[in-house]
Amino acid sequence: MSAVRNRNNVEKQSNNGAQLTEVQKKELADLQKVHPANEFGGIIGTFLLTFILPVVVYWIWASIEFNNGYLLRPETLSVEGVKAFLAQLYHYVITYAYPTKEAAIIYFSWFGFQAFLQHVVPGRKVLGSPLPGGARLEYTLNGWASWWITLIVIPIAIYFGLFKATILIDNYAPMMTVVNIWSFVFTFLLKIHAKLKGEEERMSGHFFYDFWMGFARNPRIGSFDLKLFCEARPGLILWVLMNFSIAAKQLEVYGEISLSVILVCCFHFWYIADYYYHEEAILTTMDIITEKFGYMLVYGDLSWVPFTYCFQCYYLYKHLVNGAPLHISIGYAIFVVSLKCFGFYLFRWVNSQKHDFRRNPEAPVWGKPAEFILTKRGTKLLCSGFWGICRHLNYTGDIILSWAWCLPCQFDSLAPYFYGIYFTSLDLHRCWRDHNACLVKYGDDWRAYCKRVPYNFIPGLI
């Protein structure tokens, strides 16, 4: 009965009311089949990831906060050594990261403020990519306006003494714990929401696996899209504001903002400003089109992004060299900026080319008619421009970008390189998942595309 209700619920919004094709009917039927628990290490892998990832973040935070940025580790690899290490980490978390009323007020005020902007700020109405069954959801793109409203309101509030510029870094650890708890609660609420609305799809029947992967693809309250909001608002802007708060703390404590901190703050600000300027492009990403909304995305969007992506700034504030903040030369800074610009423009140009092609397949690519493979499903796989060189040059640019963000920290510790290591692993895994998904989706057409464009990241190498 639940499967029938789910299917009928989707069919009501499918294909804008038009008659469903046989392919679309099959797509909808496939959503209600039991799906294998075979991603992210299956049932065991998703269970471990759910609980280990927050521990990893606490570990790096404690290393930066209490060990001058050097990674904490057991004195010995014996059972007693590991137990002592975990006991020390537990002490740091319980003593300094215990959730406080102030941290909860700060975060939920922030979350509510961003939800308010998402709901009331006018924006351009656009249709998302076709979903199984042909449905195209309408989105209001007001991120660019909300971004600038936030950047105006926050400094005004600081100027009039509503809170200090250092409020975020002063409450970093307790607020992180608040958000970790909220991520679990929010995911359970998504489970209830999907069940009540009959929107569950691609379920495996294994609790922890489905908790991690998600329940519904596009959960909404009215026209308010929960996944797009969490993906694009509270975590991303909080990440930038956390950097600014750390810079303010460095100025307060040491009387200066180091060039390294300025570079990292500018890099991240530029990246997020560009993200909102090209906001429509998110609607063609794997997260929005394919992924269900579960703990993986909830925790990633709300906690992982703002509390780990600021680690470079955090490290540069806490890591002292001869009692003073780390300084880099102008020449080194120019090298880092050049690398960042190369990675950024590669990332942006490649993604924009794909997005423009999806909007208008007739538009020329590099001055020539676009070449593509027309799949049996009717989808067009772009085979010219950047997408005729490698299948994921956008990931290449993103990886270069991630390491450029870490380089201002120089090389005393691995802690600030957490982002580069993580993001490289993420993109490699995402490439593998994307390949498998496309192989299932397009079959021989995808094999033909891979034969025509054999490399993923670097032409002639990989």
Curated annotation (Swiss-Prot):
The source's domain of life comes to Eukaryota
Which pathway does it operate in?
Steroid biosynthesis; zymosterol biosynthesis; zymosterol from lanosterol: step 2/6
Q: Does the record's keyword annotation contain ATP-binding? A: no
Q: Which Pfam families match?
A: ERG4_ERG24
| Source species of the chain | Dictyostelium discoideum
GO CC terms, sorted: endoplasmic reticulum membrane; nuclear outer membrane
InterPro entries in alphabetical order: ERG24_DHCR-like
Family per UniProt?
Belongs to the ERG4/ERG24 family.
User: Sorted alphabetically, which keywords does the UniProt record give?
Assistant: Lipid biosynthesis, Lipid metabolism, Membrane, NADP, Oxidoreductase, Steroid biosynthesis, Steroid metabolism, Sterol biosynthesis, Sterol metabolism, Transmembrane, Transmembrane helix
Which reactions appear under catalytic activity for this entry?
4,4-dimethyl-5alpha-cholesta-8,24-dien-3beta-ol + NADP(+) = 4,4-dimethyl-5alpha-cholesta-8,14,24-trien-3beta-ol + NADPH + H(+)
Assigned EC number: 1.3.1.70
Q: Which cysteines are joined by disulfide bonds?
A: none
GO BP annotation list: ergosterol biosynthetic process
Please identify the protein, giving its name as recorded. Answer: Delta(14)-sterol reductase
One term of GO molecular function: Delta14-sterol reductase activity
Record-annotated residues binding NADP(+)?
K354, R358, L382, W387, N394, Y395, D434, C438, L439, V440, K441, Y442, Y449
Membrane topology term = Multi-pass membrane protein
What this chain does, per the entry, is described as: Reduces the C14=C15 double bond of 4,4-dimethyl-cholesta-8,14,24-trienol to produce 4,4-dimethyl-cholesta-8,24-dienol.
Ranges that cross the membrane: 40-60, 103-123, 143-163, 172-192, 253-273, 293-313, 327-347
The record's subcellular location field reads: Membrane
- For the keyword Protein biosynthesis, the answer is no
